Amino acid sequence: MEKYEIMFIVKPTLQEAAIKKAFEDMKKVLTDNKATITEEKEMGQRDLAYEIKKHNTGYYFLLVTEAPVEAINEFNRISNISDTVIRTLITKLED
């Protein structure tokens, strides 16, 4: 399994409970696909560098995980079709 850093941004228009649920749902995608989350961080609401899907701010989340490629592919697929996640960045970390 490889080590990855995943940062994703959730819509700022959601209620607090919906934001937490989106974070838990995205973590569940990884754990259901045999990934181990080694670090998680809620970075809060921040300004975006440029407008994304008509939003100027978003709630940032960071996950560091050891995961098989299939788990990362599934996370990417789910985040792309999610109506709550507006941007995802997945970076493979070197040991």
Describe the function of each predicted region.
Residues E2-D95:
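Structured, basic alpha/beta domains of bacterial-type, RNA-associated proteins
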